[in-house]
From Swiss-Prot:
Record family assignment: Belongs to the peptidase A25 family.
SUPFAM superfamilies, per database record: HybD-like
EC nos: 3.4.24.78
Annotated organism of origin: Clostridium tetani (strain Massachusetts / E88)
Gene assigned in the entry: gpr
Name by which UniProt lists this protein: Germination protease
Enzyme class per UniProt: hydrolase
Amino acid sequence: MSVRTDLAVEAKEIYEEKNAGEIPGVELKEYRQGRIKVTEVNVLNEQGEKAMNKAIGNYITLEIPDINQYDTQYKEHISKILAKTLMPLLKIDDSMTALVVGLGNWNITPDALGPKVIEKIMITRHLKEYIPNEIDEGIRPVCGISPGVLGITGIETAEIIKAVSNKIKPDIILCIDALASRRLERVNRTIQIGNTGISPGAGVGNRRMELNEKTLGVPVIAIGVPTVVDAATVANDTIDMVLDEMIKVADKDKNFYNMLKSLDRDEKERMIKEVLNPYVGELMVTPKDVDTLMDSISKIISTGINIALQPALELEDINSYLN
């Protein structure tokens, strides 16, 4: 069964669940920045690409605890870590133009991350073009677009981005999109940054044309947050938690519960899907407070991008410009 996830860190976990030893062709690094866990997954060659089912390149994951307890200061702290992570991948100077693309359907809250980020990006390309003498020389030209989805526009997202890119000729493209996760605890708590581009809709079985350097002719940095999880995954995780509690309190049935717990996770999820599918179909689940979470996460990501693209400015200056 194909496990629905867009996260490289979860692809790593899937491999480790089924194989012993290190992942061939993959370099891993884990460390913490305060309360934030950072995982770097570098797919080095075709061997690693096959093992991980991920394109050759770098994937960096920030796992953030306490999603509902953010204050402004902590949001800015996360944004600065995101910016610090982005900067080595961007490799652009003051004169290079960046195109920021907010992927997703703005009418569906869990899929509206990209458009919400674009609303808060510091857009400067028009100022550099029309009033160059009135703005700081260190400000980089940045433009943004929310191309919508095929069902709204009737045009493939990649076709819109390709046409815009051909016209304005950016030096780098940043794509922001909502992702899918296989773990409940990562939904709306994880930010993935990668330099291999993105396949919109892949995590929910609705794969569109890929957005990467090969298709667009420009380096593409992808930034994503898992906002949904498969209903079968929720059921699977719930069963595991129930079994854990039963094992703790059971005396004579402990071995039976341990046997159930030891069943292959993917096999359990496949069986759950078979049971659920006739009743609910392909169901994806998101938290009930997703509106508030989207506002917080989009602000974190947009601020991180603004800091990374405008290193000559202080955060106060960026916020002043946006307000």
